[in-house]
Regions:
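Active-site pocket-lining segments that scaffold enzyme catalytic pockets across diverse folds
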Residues: 1-16
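Thiamine diphosphate
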Residues: 4-6, 32-119
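Generic structural hydrophobic/aromatic packing signal, biased to beta-strands
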Residues: 10, 19-21, 83
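Acidic-glycine-rich active-site phosphate/pyrophosphate-binding loop
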Residues: 17-36
């Protein structure tokens, strides 16, 4: 499934939650599908979507979903340790792995080779 199709399928299920969306193209896609007050577009913050989502989840009782790309996660691996340490029940990090840094020219990430973020 392509990222756009995934975002389009998810949006109807995320009406009551806060959604933090990754830099660049994913934010543009989410905006074009459905711009809502509960959507936060992280333009110019590559690698920080998960950190921003975590911070937001620690300040509200609402569910927070962060949509992050594999390239951004790889740029800020420390956020995964912080998320695991704090472990807020109202936070979901959804990593969309397309094997590339899509917003900077589609250079391949290590997930396109031997690295798996799922394991």
């Amino acid at each position: 499934m392509r990222r756009y199709e995934l975002i389009k399928a998810l949006i109807p299920e995320l009406q009551e939650v806060l959604v933090v969306c990754n830099i660049g193209i994913p934010s543009q896609e989410m905006f074009s599908i459905s711009d809502r007050e509960n959507h936060f577009y992280m333009l110019g913050s590559m690698g920080l979507c998960s950190s921003i989502g975590l911070g937001l989840s620690l300040t509200t009782k609402k569910t927070v979903v962060a949509l992050e790309g594999d390239g951004s996660v790889l740029m800020n691996l420390g956020s995964l340790a912080t998320i695991a340490n704090r472990a807020p029940r109202n936070f979901v990090l959804l990593v969309i792995d397309n094997g590339s840094y899509g917003s900077t020219g589609d250079q391949p990430t290590f997930t396109s080779e031997a690295t798996s973020l799922a394991e």
